[in-house]
Regions:
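Core catalytic lobe of class I
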Residues: 1-164
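S-adenosyl-L-methionine
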Residues: 168-207
């Protein structure tokens, strides 16, 4: 995707996020540093105040073609300019922009899967228990799982059918609760157990 098209894509996504956040709602955006300019511009143009950029320092490098191998990931931090943002009293003023968390040894679920303790750090700092957290790029469902563990409510979405399935499977495996998991397809409410059977039956036919 060309740079200008990518900017428009980000701007549209961030505007949709902004429309569904409460006044002063905080936002964190993990992103690739090579696209930092587009991310920052779209973030600000969508109505967010860019308060700072935190750095996730990983315990090992991510091999690539760059002369310098990447061992960090930037995280934009900001909030809507239409109200006062929430900051946890327990967080105080001792938090820093450097976040040292080990990256997953294997990313079987998603190539950029985040560890839950990493995501819990900003979520706890910027939201109260039972608050709603939105993630419009669900990926492997790490934000959903983190909210489950920190007593938050997560609204997430994922356009890729493969990773939407990963999110469902991961949630059921981690919580052990499939009874309340379902998919609405063409107006029909389909239980998770029926979806699993549908996949298994399809696999048997392909053998």
């Amino acid at each position: 995707m060309k740079s200008d098209k990518f900017y428009e894509f980000l701007l549209s996504a961030f505007k949709n996020m902004a429309e569904h956040l409460e006044k002063g709602g905080a936002a964190y955006v993990f992103h690739a540093d090579t696209e930092g300019l587009n991310f920052r511009k779209a973030f600000v143009d969508a109505g967010f105040h860019l308060s700072g950029c935190c750095i996730w320092v990983k315990n090992s490098i991510v091999l690539g073609r760059s002369d310098y191998q990447w061992q960090h990931e930037p995280v934009l931090y900001g909030f809507l300019q239409n109200g006062k943002h929430y900051w946890s009293k327990t967080a105080g003023r001792s938090q820093t922009t450097i976040w040292n968390f080990d990256k997953p040894k294997k990313n079987q679920n998603h190539p950029t899967s985040k560890p839950l303790d990493l995501l819990a750090y900003p979520i706890v700092n910027s939201s109260m228990e039972n608050a709603i957290v939105i993630d419009t790029f669900g990926g492997s469902g790490s934000t959903l799982m983190t909210c489950e563990k920190t007593n938050r409510i997560c609204y997430t979405m994922e356009l890729d059918e493969k990773y939407a399935s990963v999110i469902l499977r991961r949630y059921v495996e981690d919580t052990g609760n499939a009874d309340n998991v379902f998919v609405i397809r063409n107006g029909d409410k389909i239980p998770y157990s029926a979806l699993v059977k549908e996949v298994e039956d399809g696999d048997e036919k392909n053998e």
